[in-house]
Regions:
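Short, structured beta-strand-loop surface elements
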Residues: 60-119, 125-127
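A generic local structural motif
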Residues: 15-18, 41-43, 60-62, 107-109
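Extreme N-terminal tail/first-helix region
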Residues: 1-24
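N-terminal short leaders/motifs
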Residues: 1-5, 46-49, 74-79
Length: 137
């Protein structure tokens, strides 16, 4: 049995509302899906959160556009502080769909990478979970 130590953190589950709040606070997340031949794929992307869905700008020739449309995907957002040994992680699961339209309102994600991204990959989130760790001290 392991004893309590100040170097260990306390892990807490986040509520769905807390998960959505944290997800909307970061500019980059990780899109994950099962690619060809059952091989996992994970890429970092810029995104926005709008009305219970995740919006990602992508190019028609991108791996995500070719492999994610009408498919189950996962999306992960996190942040951490190594010095404080603290952070949080939010995981979303759902289905991705390609759209030509922009997200409603002024919610188009700012894309850091160059190139033309005329498509929107929209993830309809079916499940959202999260955890937060605080330093035990």
């Amino acid at each position: 049995m392991q004893s309590e130590s100040p170097i260990h953190g306390r892990l807490f589950e986040l509520s769905p509302d807390e998960c959505w709040e944290r997800a909307g606070s970061r500019p980059v997340g990780r899109l994950a899906w099962t690619g060809p031949h059952g091989r996992p794929a994970v890429i970092p992307v810029n995104f926005t959160v709008v009305d219970g869905s995740v919006h990602i700008r992508t190019a028609a020739y991108s791996q995500a556009a070719r492999e994610c449309d009408d498919s189950p995907v996962a999306f992960e957002i996190d942040t951490f502080d190594e010095a404080e040994r603290s952070g949080w992680s939010v995981l979303m699961r759902g289905h991705a769909h390609l759209d030509f339209a922009s997200p409603p309102g002024d919610h188009d994600p700012e894309v850091w990478a160059d190139g033309t991204r005329t498509l929107q990959l929209r993830i309809e989130v079916e499940e959202i979970t999260g955890r937060q760790i605080h330093h035990g001290g």
